[in-house]
């Protein structure tokens, strides 16, 4: 039958130009300690950026090779609301309302440790924000799609 492969990632921002999570650990949620990674591009949470896009390279701190689906699920669930980039001071409480994840490839076929996350802010108003994300393995192959609605609580 007909088969159409997902478009690969083109020209990802290099890890070497990123800002390591550890550099801003005091401003970030503690669960990020479970991951090694860096923010790339012009936005990161609480940076005051008006960007609608959040990009990062990320991998688990521990070996997840025996848990291929869980490895991708945790990676896909770790990005904060893109809207938090618009704020210049922590903390703005936020919580998931709904989340969906679609695997594009069988998780067992994903062999790398590093993932490139490309998340877009679709809309935000009245305490709700929607975002879409693409999770790529280091080779550039699209692994999964994420869709999330979150509530945020301005003080």
Model regions: which residues?
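Terminal targeting signals and extreme-terminal segments of soluble enzymes
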Residues: 1-155
